[in-house]
Design a protein with these regions (language model features):
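Acidic/hydrophobic-patterned starts of short beta strands in beta-sheet-rich repeat architectures
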Residues: 54-64, 107-115
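Blade-edge motifs of beta-propeller repeat domains
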Residues: 26-43, 83-99, 192, 198-201
Length: 201
């Protein structure tokens, strides 16, 4: 009995030593795949990695050089079976640009990245998570102004509208919780050889 227990403990100990090594090996392979991809696609002038769905595989978020008055578009890639796979994209309208920096906003609780869109009569914020190999909307907010203003927050394709003054206060708190305080800003890096070596680890 003692011998079996000793063998079991030894096996668990060896496994615990092997696991970090296998994770490091996977991360190294991941960094090589992303580095090669960025070198082959120089039009992606900005990049960073972020484990959006917290599955141990970092996603690659890239962006191109945009015109000053156009939206920033962020393209998301991941790795499936040692192949790079396009997941989707999110946009930040000009009003939501962070100066000349390229930034992405991430809600770690919902495992989702933020999109910000504007129109002549209002704006909308969306949170997208990874489902399979695509980006899927998880929470959305719409605020349109004008003669008949609309305040709504949607989950699972169902929108809730806020009409009274007290309702709108609740709306503002939810927007803050989901899209502002609930999100952390991550800065993208210029796609240079030194930055690839530094940040793709």
């Amino acid at each position: 009995m003692k011998k079996k227990m000793f063998i079991l403990i030894s096996f668990i100990f060896c496994l615990s030593l092997m696991l970090p090594i296998s994770i490091q090996a996977a991360q190294k392979k991941e960094s090589v795949i992303y580095s090669d991809f960025l070198q082959e696609n120089p039009s992606y002038t900005w990049f960073r990695t972020l484990d959006i769905n917290k599955d141990g595989v970092k996603e690659l978020i890239v962006s191109k050089k945009e015109l000053e008055f156009s939206a920033n578009v962020y393209y998301v890639y991941t790795i499936k079976k040692n192949e790079i796979v396009y997941v989707g994209k999110v946009s930040h309208s000009r009003a939501f640009k962070d100066g000349k920096s390229k930034v992405i906003f991430y809600n770690s609780k919902l495992k989702a990245i933020r999109e910000a869109l504007t129109s002549p009569r209002g704006f909308g914020l969306n949170l997208y998570k990874i489902s399979g190999s695509t980006l899927k909307e998880t929470v959305r907010m719409n605020r349109s102004l004008g003669r008949f203003p609309v305040y709504s927050i949607g989950k699972n394709n169902k929108d809730k509208y806020y009409t009274t003054a007290s309702d709108i206060k609740k709306f503002d708190k939810l927007v803050d919780r989901y899209f502002y305080k609930g999100c952390k800003k991550y800065v993208l890096y210029k796609n240079t050889s030194s930055n690839r070596a530094k940040y793709l680890k």
